[in-house]
Design a protein with these regions (language model features):
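C-terminal "cap" of GNAT-fold acetyltransferases
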Residues: 95-105, 188-191, 210-214
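Conserved acetyl-CoA-binding loop-helix of GNAT-fold acetyltransferases
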Residues: 54-58, 156, 162-179, 199
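Conserved GNAT acetyl-CoA-binding A-motif
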Residues: 64-74, 177-189
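A conserved beta-strand-loop-helix scaffold within acyl/acetyltransferase catalytic domains
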Residues: 119-157
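Short secondary-structure junctions
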Residues: 20-35, 85-93, 116-117, 203-204
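N-terminal charged segments
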Residues: 1-69, 73-79
Length: 214
């Protein structure tokens, strides 16, 4: 059963996210600061519905730094989107959502005949890749932390979309997570991914907006 406390959902997401990526998190002004160390950003400061005034004050941590991200999660991110932003701060993304689900024993859609698959394990990250000849058609990763799983970088390449591959990848990763003891899942979803996950029984818990320095 999904937790009712959205703070718990955020905490679980950060715990599983840092676990699967092998990264760390500290705290700044009482909020988690994730040391992402990725191509897109170096750090991400995550706050849960802090109020507009506090959110504006937190912008100083990313202002002028194109490698720093500030993310707010809330049931309604509208007030944060319209909050005044100083120069040196821009909206990076405003269509993501934090989602959770109880992991069910759902059937895995069959793989198209022309597709092959492979599994790769790198630390806590288990990656499932679909290939058509030499081309990657779809890919996704899962990590398990106790009874929790998070799903990361689930993507179907443009040339292979609208063929149900995303559903196949998610169902396969879910079975892998359940086999490793996971009973619940949490993830951050893009707008496109959100449609797929909703159709597979995932619940939207919070909307998300991310700012970056410039």
């Amino acid at each position: 059963m999904a937790p009712d406390d959205v703070q718990q959902v955020v905490d679980e997401w950060i715990a599983t996210w840092t676990h699967i990526r092998g990264i760390t998190a500290g705290r700044v002004d009482g909020w988690p600061l994730v040391h992402v160390a990725a191509a897109s950003r170096e750090t991400e400061l995550v706050c849960l519905d802090p109020g507009v005034d506090d959110f504006v004050a937190l912008m100083r941590h990313v202002r002028g730094d194109p490698r720093a991200m500030l993310t707010v999660a809330a049931r309604d991110v509208g007030p944060y989107l319209t909050a005044r932003r100083p120069s040196g701060v821009r909206v990076d993304r405003d269509d993501e959502a934090l989602m959770s689900a109880t992991l069910g024993d759902d059937p895995i859609p069959p793989l198209p005949d022309e597709m092959t698959f492979r599994w790769d394990v790198d630390g806590q990250r288990i990656t499932y890749t679909l290939e058509a000849g030499d081309a990657v058609a779809a890919v996704g990763s899962v990590g398990v932390l106790g009874e929790l799983a998070t799903f990361d970088a689930v993507e179907t390449m443009p040339a292979f979309q609208r063929r149900g591959l995303g559903r196949h990848v998610m169902a396969t990763l879910t079975a892998q997570a359940r086999g490793r003891g996971a009973v619940r899942g949490v993830l951050a979803a893009s707008a496109q991914g959100r449609q797929l996950y909703t159709s597979m029984g995932w619940d939207t818990r919070l909307e998300m907006v991310s700012l970056m320095g410039e």
